[in-house]
Amino acid sequence: MKELGVFDNTIFHVSDEPTIYNADTYQKALQMVEPYLEGAKIIDALSHLDLYEKGIVKNPVPTNDSIHQFLDAGLKNGWVYYCCGQGYKVSNRYIAMPGWRTRILGAQLYKYKMEGFLHWGYNFYNCQYSLHTIDPYRINDGEDAFPAGDPFIVYPGADGKPVESMRLPVMEDAMNDMRLLEYLESLTSREHVLDLIDDYGNLDLRFDEYPSGCDYLQDLWETAAKEVEELIK
């Protein structure tokens, strides 16, 4: 990978959601691969704080319903993720969720300076353990394994190219919200943008607390975009 020039942009992971109960085997697995990954970044999805506090997982990727525990413990510029288990209070992209609940992620990523966002299900068209394939146009939950829409965000096209779901453009909106806020920060200050996010909605935006409905996000976008337009004239 170094010869190809992609090593610095490659991220490795050892185990999905290790816990204190399998910490010994996680550490053994980590020790097996570490000699071959010198200088590489290793991240692992994590829901429980203890392995991070003990220094066993140095670069955790917390779920968005546990992220505030990690932030309170000092996590800086980390990653965050959601998947099939994050269906209460927090953002996700299930088929049954309204678009604003999916889109709020962008403002959250900006406010908490998340370095990355992780999700597993781009085009998983199998049953839970990949014993056989499924037709995602008819079966959208991996045969009762996941919330509908969790395993994929695009559909297979007849020509082998992905077909957008209705949720994919909403995820793009979320990322564009984040990019707009970052750009406005470059023209003003981080404090100004944070005031815009929180004071405009009269709230303290969190991953588990955010305005319901489309108005907040639409107003935030229009206000930020108008300020950018005025500043770059």
Segments from the language model and where they lie:
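Catalytic-core regions of glycoside hydrolase
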Residues: 1-130
